[in-house]
């Protein structure tokens, strides 16, 4: 009986979640530009494996639910940057002046006593014709949400929302960075 209880308490199921990027709404002020950026490489260089995002842990810190994205993290990040650039009229489908690359250094969401998400991305901008690096910057965001459910019944989708907010914050700050925008002139 003790072995059965220990197995039940230590078993960890994996749940796949979606992530979304919401372009700025009409009442949010964003600076539009000219289509000049093409998304090139998005590299997932996190310490987590594949689409892994994190876990929900019980009161003693044992993982009870493992959280994975439904798509590779590099694809989620590419989609977010694509939507962000397009909503600001910066995405060039053809004949881009600049190539956008990014390294996803950290993107994870978890719950122990609160729902937490962290996202850290290094963005690079290259001249398309010469391949010369003209801009490189780190962007970081952390989001936290208090949740009354800290148990097996915790909702993995709520953690996905918090993680999506962290990713959105990083992507929006990167695309709206005044230093980056000055490079585009």
List each model region and its residues.
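Sec-dependent signal peptide recognition
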Residues: 1-2
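A short, hydrophobic beta-strand-centered structural micro-motif
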Residues: 34-41, 91-110
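Envelope-exposed proteins and targeting segments
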Residues: 33-35, 96-100, 115-121, 135
């Amino acid at each position: 009986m003790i072995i059965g209880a220990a197995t039940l308490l230590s078993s960890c199921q994996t749940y796949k979640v979606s992530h979304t990027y919401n372009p700025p709404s009409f009442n949010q002020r964003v600076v539009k530009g000219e289509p000049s950026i093409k998304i090139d490489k998005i590299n997932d260089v996190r310490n987590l494996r594949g689409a892994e995002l994190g876990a929900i842990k019980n009161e003693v810190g044992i993982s009870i639910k493992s959280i994975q994205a439904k798509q590779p993290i590099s694809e989620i990040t590419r989609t977010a940057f694509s939507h962000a650039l397009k909503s600001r009229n910066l995405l060039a489908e053809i004949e881009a002046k600049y190539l956008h690359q990014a390294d996803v250094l950290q993107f994870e969401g978890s719950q122990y006593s609160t729902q937490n998400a962290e996202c850290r991305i290094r963005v690079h901008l290259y001249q398309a014709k010469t391949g010369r690096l003209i801009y490189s910057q780190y962007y970081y965001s952390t989001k936290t949400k208090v949740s009354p459910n800290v148990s097996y019944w915790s909702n993995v989708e709520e953690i996905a929302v918090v993680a999506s907010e962290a990713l959105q914050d990083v992507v929006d700050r990167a695309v709206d960075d005044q230093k980056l925008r000055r490079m585009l002139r």
